Amino acid sequence: MGNEFQHRTVLLDEAVDALVTRPDGVYVDGTFGRGGHSRAVLARLGYAGRLIAFDKDPRAIETAESIEDARFEIVHDSFAAMKGALDARGIGRVSGVLLDLGVSSPQVDDPARGFSFRANGPLDMRMDPTRGESAAEWLARASVQELTEVIRDYGEERFAFQIAKAIVARRAESDRLGPLDSTGELAQIVGHVVKTREKGKDPATRTFQAIRIHVNQELADLQVVLEAALSLLEQGGRLVVISFHSLEDRIVKRFLQAHASAPAVDRRLPIRAADLPRPPLKLLGRMFPNDAEVAANPRARSAVMRIAERVAP
């Protein structure tokens, strides 16, 4: 397979250092991508260690299948299927779960995948192009209200209503102009609506992010996998999550904080702190790429990595 679209793994050493606590453990890479984290984890594991990786992208699966290592297995599915997939393999507990969220550089850089507003391509945006509804198919049927809600909530775009109306107006011209099915035309529509400019950011950035998140159910899947990871982690096991925008990070932060805090109790009740159940997680902090990594890989700029450890059985 060609490697014309390269991917630089963000926070590679930092993530693996945080994740791997014992070489003979079972680990999960929820987002194989092009395998940067997985290969680094395998390098840390001993003979008895094991790594199960997940990815929806068929091209990622092709890359993973080139890894000849008996300790490694790739699953062609969303990380939201993690619990069921591990149950089917007789794995009830794991030593660590790594999630590197969002879209990978090869997906963005390949115009044929339909993620990018910088180069024209088919309006697809599916991480697995063989499953589900494409962006073009969704845009062809969504109401102004649904479009507005998605673009506003997932893109944090203040011109969401105006963009939604412009998309529906263009759709009404489909008999004359053909379907809205290219990234270039969608970016052009958004650019005509969004007159203000954020420094260093294309006006279509927020809308494309929103549609991509919706098409791939990214935030819903994130909620599912966080719960799955918590249930799978053994005592001392680590959860390491790298996110790239505020919506993802907010979900991760709130989840970790909720499971690292003691339950609230009315102070008037005769209950001691020692009598309360111990929170399952301990927060081990967050990390950001250093200046050198950002200089070498500008896409790392927005990354934040959060780490938690399971401390209660």
From Swiss-Prot:
SUPFAM superfamilies: Putative methyltransferase TM0872, insert domain, S-adenosyl-L-methionine-dependent methyltransferases. It comes from the Bacteria. It is found in: Cytoplasm. InterPro entries: RsmH, SAM-dep_MeTrfase_MraW_recog, SAM-dependent_MTases_sf. GO terms for molecular function: rRNA (cytosine-N4-)-methyltransferase activity. Gene3D superfamilies: Putative methyltransferase TM0872, insert domain, Vaccinia Virus protein VP39. One of its GO terms (biological process) is rRNA base methylation. Its main location: cytoplasm. Its EC number is 2.1.1.199. It catalyses: cytidine(1402) in 16S rRNA + S-adenosyl-L-methionine = N(4)-methylcytidine(1402) in 16S rRNA + S-adenosyl-L-homocysteine + H(+). Keywords: Cytoplasm, Methyltransferase, rRNA processing, S-adenosyl-L-methionine, Transferase. S-adenosyl-L-methionine binds at residues 35-37, 55, 79, 100, 107. It is an enzyme of class 2 (transferase). GO terms for cellular component: cytoplasm. NCBIfam families: 16S rRNA (cytosine(1402)-N(4))-methyltransferase RsmH (TIGR00006). PANTHER family: 12S RRNA N4-METHYLCYTIDINE METHYLTRANSFERASE, S-ADENOSYL-METHYLTRANSFERASE MRAW. Belongs to the methyltransferase superfamily. RsmH family. Specifically methylates the N4 position of cytidine in position 1402 (C1402) of 16S rRNA. This is Ribosomal RNA small subunit methyltransferase H. The gene is rsmH.
